[in-house]
């Protein structure tokens, strides 16, 4: 099953690939690719079904080795890819050549891009539907389309607030539970120490802002009959943008690129006192800011109204099977096993710092132990409830590569004094609508 409103002639041609290719100045044919033979030519009589899996998560080699040991009829070879966009570029190129691997790791936001190529196997025919009850409910909505199941959820990124508990205690600042309190804390902190800012608004971090908007009930994309709806500048996302614009105008937040040396330096010195992040953010801080041991804690994400328990998501990936596989049944078996087997998930958590989508895994011992870096706090006390509070109706668009690029450029303009963050949302809505229409998508607004 495919989106009924896909651009003509693109069943095997991703819009994400179109974008990347245009950026490189390469002209590519828009006709659908043919269904030639796949590279994998194993047959049942030649021994185990040999599968190739592309992904980037550390520890996957150990998970694959465990699967191969316990499934003698199937042999999986893991090809480690760079992660993120470089992996997707490689996959889109392989799709065009009808030479995909059997399996691939894909983040949630890219699933519509890949599904639009027609290259993904509907896993419902291989019993994937039987797994639905095992996963955090909102993740299942991310991988299904009608009766079709195009991926198996792997991990998630519900949001919480990491904060310098030493600074909050030093300056007698209460841990904020609402965004209004967060803004007040920003004022108090900066007044107490002009070199300390409540947080960092990283303009190029589109996934981070999307998670914040998601928490507030924002829906950038939707489906209206046979067409897409684009509503980036909706009231909920405008409220989030206006809030952060207020902090920017008062010079209470920084605007540096996250995940950089300078960013981690500021986390270490206290120049940045909070970071709205996901479970995986914990290891990013502890690994890159070793001097911060005992200085950081975690709390639930602030709410827009007191007493609410709403959350958004930042990060997480899935497992898909590509149609060029000569062994889709065996590939589906591996995909289902990878994110439901307790031993595999244990490796996933300890080796990659992943936060599993499987509900039962959230009760595992490794996730419910005191963390020495965070004052021996059990971080799962924050993130387990958060994982159930993510809005399950959130919908990704079919051109998320373009969307994030434009959003980042427009936010960068705003943080450099060229307009506001709400202006950036409006500009991104216009450019996204225009881009989708040029690619042949039906857009109703």
Where in this protein do the model-derived segments appear?
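Alpha-to-beta junction loops
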Residues: 95-106, 119-121, 195-196, 269-278
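Hinge/lid segment of periplasmic solute-binding proteins
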Residues: 108-159, 212, 295-299, 373-374, ...
